Amino acid sequence: AMALARRKGIDSPVPTLVKMLDLPNTETRYGACRALAQFRGKAAPAVPALQKNLKHDDLWMRVHAAQTLAAIGQSAMSTLPELLTMVAKGATKEDPRAMEQRYLSFALFNARGGMLSRSLNGVDRELLYKAVKAGLKNEDGRARGSYSSIYTKLSLEELKPILPDIYRAIIEPSPSGIMFADQIQTAGLELFAKHRISEGIELTAAYAKNMKPHASEHRIKTVMTLMKSYGAHSQRAIPILENAIDYFDNREPDFPKRLSKQKAQTVRDTIKEIKTSTNRPKLISIKSFL
């Protein structure tokens, strides 16, 4: 497929591949999708046939069709309402772990190549909100993480309908795909700090201790920077931070002791700084949205 897409001086195979999308054999259709994806925008004539396959009985056929539409890009944006509706559907009896939603999350929201990775201009906000609300409940950490791409593309006013869902995605880590579970949690904490959301203070302090251990010796620096951004308001979370210090110094299991001590010192330095802070930025609360 890659060789076909790169070959010059030959008739385009796109029309033939489009015809293959209507053949009875699903494996043949899969192959046509993978090949068409290599042509990117040049595969625009395949959009109607691919959209038809979004209704196929086979889950993986629907996934392949969605991935190919995402690869086509701008010429396939007309299918976005249907794709967002599919994401919003979530888990079903036939798909209890929402695998369809998982792969569509990547196709639409992945920061690298997702259909919505560059802009949300013209996107129906109600459909977007429904998709994000459902997607942030996906059991897979990497799938949830893909939704962080929209956090910086929406104003605070636009974020309000999904703030409760962003909040839950911070405090309830994904049960699988834990290697990537921190992405959506950290992105949520960064968003709360950016908009000075009061609840972010305790969430950030608690996350210092509760984040996944892998690479936490690096991540703790980012988390403490967020902590300090709240200024003197962070003083109310000092007991939580002191508990984290005790945990790192004395109780953290299965983690290099030297790195645990390093994390403890990072938190100590943060406490020292916020104790002397006089900066009190204006905070807002999300209680009215929960």
Please place each PLM-identified region on the residue numbering.
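Structural detector for internal amphipathic alpha-helices that build alpha-solenoid repeat scaffolds
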Residues: A1-G9, K19, E27-K42, K52, ...
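Amphipathic alpha-helical scaffolding segments comprising HEAT/armadillo-like alpha-solenoid repeats
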Residues: G9-D22, G41-K55, Q74-G90, M115-A134, ...
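Alpha-helix capping/termination motifs at helix-coil junctions
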Residues: V14, C33, K287-L290
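Helix-loop junctions that connect tandem helical modules in alpha-solenoid scaffolds
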Residues: K89-P96, A134-E139, A169-M179, N210-A215, ...
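Short leucine-rich amphipathic alpha-helical surface patches
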Residues: M227, I245-D249
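Short, low-complexity, Pro/Ser/Thr/Gly-rich segments in the mature regions of secreted, periplasmic
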Residues: T276-F289
